[in-house]
Swiss-Prot record:
F(1)F(0) ATP synthase produces ATP from ADP in the presence of a proton or sodium gradient. F-type ATPases consist of two structural domains, F(1) containing the extramembraneous catalytic core and F(0) containing the membrane proton channel, linked together by a central stalk and a peripheral stalk. During catalysis, ATP synthesis in the catalytic domain of F(1) is coupled via a rotary mechanism of the central stalk subunits to proton translocation. The gene is atpH. The lineage of its organism: Bacteria, Pseudomonadati, Pseudomonadota, Alphaproteobacteria, Hyphomicrobiales. HAMAP family: ATP_synth_delta_bact. It comes from Methylobacterium sp. (strain 4-46). It is a peripheral membrane protein. SUPFAM superfamilies: N-terminal domain of the delta subunit of the F1F0-ATP synthase (SSF47928). It is found in: Cell inner membrane. This is ATP synthase subunit delta. Its main location: membrane. One of its GO terms (cellular component) is plasma membrane. F-type ATPases have 2 components, F(1) - the catalytic core - and F(0) - the membrane proton channel. F(1) has five subunits: alpha(3), beta(3), gamma(1), delta(1), epsilon(1). F(0) has three main subunits: a(1), b(2) and c(10-14). The alpha and beta chains form an alternating ring which encloses part of the gamma chain. F(1) is attached to F(0) by a central stalk formed by the gamma and epsilon chains, while a peripheral stalk is formed by the delta and b chains.
């Protein structure tokens, strides 16, 4: 499988990578990749929003039975079924819930790779208009020669401009960096 930038190499190692790879292969064989992605995304969103669920996932204090029972309740309430639900149950039964966020990230990497999508981290000083966002996507699509998924973040400390990370390449065209360069050049000129 092709690796897009440094993301796959670091994300697909260890336990998380093995679990994610097994899930991806099964989902692909059953033509359920998108359904599994949706279920995992829903669980991941719940995990980010709930301090109690985070405690359940991270704490070794809870027994396997308690974790499985709590996960069952969350899955039922969230309407997560099929392979995604079975995968989350398996992680709970094997005392691997603490690795689940990494497993979900690794699964997403595999899905993007299979679909020929690369991920780009984009930081801007202020939220972009839809037109600017489309322009950024089109430019990155041309550079990557692939479909691009944006991870957009607003960072007022940039003052202005943009910082883009695409795979192992990074372009910093922020006003903050330009001002720092000018400051260093002036200091060195003394």
């Amino acid at each position: 499988m092709a690796q897009n930038g440094s993301e796959s190499g670091s994300t697909l190692g260890g336990v998380a990578g093995r679990y994610a790879s097994a899930l991806f292969e099964l989902a692909r064989d059953e033509r359920a990749v998108d359904a599994v992605t949706e279920g995992l995304d829903r669980f991941d969103a719940l995990l980010r929003e709930s301090a109690d669920l985070q405690r359940l996932v991270r704490s070794p204090v809870f027994s396997t039975e308690e974790q499985v029972k709590a996960v069952e309740a969350v899955l039922a309430r969230a309407g997560i079924t099929g392979l995604a639900a079975n995968f989350i149950r398996l992680a709970a039964a094997n005392r691997r819930l603490f690795v689940l966020p990494d497993m979900i990230r690794a699964y997403r990497v595999l899905v993007r790779e299979a679909k020929g999508i690369v991920r780009a981290e984009v930081r801007l000083a202020e939220p972009p208009s839809d037109a600017v966002l489309e322009e950024i996507k089109a430019s990155l699509r041309d550079v990557a020669r692939a479909e691009v998924e944006l991870d957009l973040r607003v960072d007022p400390s940039l003052i202005g401009g943009i910082v883009v990370k695409l795979g192992s390449r990074m372009v910093d065209a922020s006003l903050r960096t330009r001002l720092n360069s000018i400051r260093l050049a002036m200091r060195d000129a003394r």
